A protein has these predicted regions:
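A detector for small-residue-rich transmembrane helices and their helix-helix packing motifs
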Residues: 2-227
Length: 227
């Protein structure tokens, strides 16, 4: 039987260091979220109803800016801190590896769409606040892109890493009546869909960033890995 050779992806887009200014952009965004939340707490009676996403304001009055301002408003310190941890992680990764058009442009646009779809499913008296929809969109996008892009890691190991991270950061330890898990699910689903579309539109440039090396020839064709 003849010798067979194959190739292995040694590096991908995600093997490189995040782009410059990733830390600064992350710190700036987190500062904005924390600052607006603090203002809302100090002036809750006047400011909180103005910034929250409500059916009356968004669906009836056309105040679509509420879909974005609601992201920066949180109910209490624990609410904002729990979101801030994941926002720091995913903001750094999305801006660092995919740039300005993924974060903040696509991220905030899809977070607004997440809030809009969520409002459509709730009674008119429900209002939405918090960055959880954004966090879950970012998680869905990043985890999906990792599966699609990081071919320097074997498929099984990639899936295992994604499942473990998803269970660790996305699965709630307790269930609370005032938390919109529906918004979480919508954000996560939109994140996955956004990643699939983004990957297809940018597949050529993403694959061009790969560094491929040839493996030593061997005899068993069943061990050949697909390109």
């Amino acid at each position: 039987m003849g010798d067979f050779s194959t190739h292995r992806v040694r590096e991908t887009l995600l093997s490189r260091k995040p782009r410059e200014w990733s830390l600064e952009i992350t710190a700036l965004f987190l500062s904005m979220i924390m600052g607006i939340s603090l203002l809302a707490w100090r002036n809750g009676a006047a400011l909180l109803p103005t910034l929250a996403a409500t059916s009356e304001g968004v669906l009836k009055q056309g105040e679509y800016w509420r879909l974005l301002t609601a992201i920066a408003v949180h109910g209490d310190v624990m609410h904002v801190l729990s979101n801030a941890i994941l926002l720091t992680f995913f903001t750094y990764l999305l801006f660092g590896y995919f740039g300005f058009w993924v974060f903040p442009v696509m991220s905030l646009a899809m977070a607004g769409l997440t809030n809009y779809i969520s409002l459509l499913t709730y009674p008119s008296e429900v209002s939405l606040i918090g960055a959880s929809g954004l966090v879950y969109w970012m998680a869905g996008f990043w985890l999906s892109m990792y599966l699609l892009v990081e071919r320097s890691v074997g498929p099984r190991k990639r899936v295992l890493r994604v499942v473990c991270l998803a269970l660790l950061v996305l699965l709630p330890s307790t269930f609370q009546a005032n938390v919109s898990y529906r918004t979480h699910a919508i954000g996560l689903g939109l994140g996955v869909v956004s990643a699939l579309v983004y990957f297809q539109r940018n597949r050529e440039s993403i694959r061009a960033a790969e560094v491929v090396e040839l493996e030593e020839p061997f005899d068993d064709p069943d061990e050949i890995l697909p390109p």
